[in-house]
Amino acid sequence: MPILLCFAAGLASETPSLARISRFSTVVALLLLAAAYALIPYSRPVLAPVSLGEGSSWQGDVCLQSHPSTCAPAAAATLLRLSGIEAGEQELVRACLTSSYGTEPLGLYRGLALSTRGPLVPRVADSDPLAWERRGELPNIALVRFETPSREDHVLARHERRGSLRWLLGPRSEGHAIVVLGQDGDGNWQIADPAIGTTTWSRDEFLGRFTGDAIYLANTR
C-alpha cells in the first residue's frame, strides 16, 4: 500500500489538469498517508500493547498463549524450541510487533528472523500442505481460520464494538497460528496449538482451515 500511494503521488504531481496548489496538496496528503501505512506495524504495539505476566507457560515443548492475541508469538516460541532455540512468549511479542489486535504475517516473519541464529532462517512454506514433508518444510507455523467464532474472535469483537482503532491497527479478519508437526499414518495432522497444547486434526479439518500461509525454519547449511 505505501508503494501504491507513493506511485499515486507521483502521478498526481504530473497531472496538468490539477491546479498547482491542488497538485501540491494531493501529493503531500498521499505521501503522509503512505508514511502512516508504513509506520502502522510499529505503532500498533505502542498504541495497543499486550499486557503479559512474567515468563512463559509451557506444556511440554508447546508454548501456551497467555493472551487472546498472542497465538503467533507463542507458536513462534514453540517452533524455535523444536529447532533448538529457546525464546519466550514475551520476547517474541516484542519481536513480532504483536499488539492487542494480533500479529501480522510479516510481523511473525520478523520475529522468527530476529530470533534465529546460525544456518536457520525463516522461509515461506509451500501453499500445498501435502508437499511439506517432501520439501522438508516441517514443522512449520500455519495460519488457520475457523468457521465458528473462537474465544479470540469474541474478545477482539468487543474491542471493535467499543469504538477502538481496530479498523486501522488490527487485521481485517481473525485467524489463529498453530505449529504443524506432521502427519500420522492415517493422514491426520499432529498440531501444537498455543491455545490448548498438542492435538490432532483430521486431514479434511486441516485443509478446510488452512489459509495457505505457513512459515518454516530452513537450514541453509
Please place each PLM-identified region on the residue numbering.
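Noncatalytic regulatory segments and standalone regulatory/sensor domains
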Residues: 1-29, 33-43, 150-221
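Sec-exported extracytoplasmic/periplasmic mature domains
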Residues: 76, 80-85, 97, 101, ...
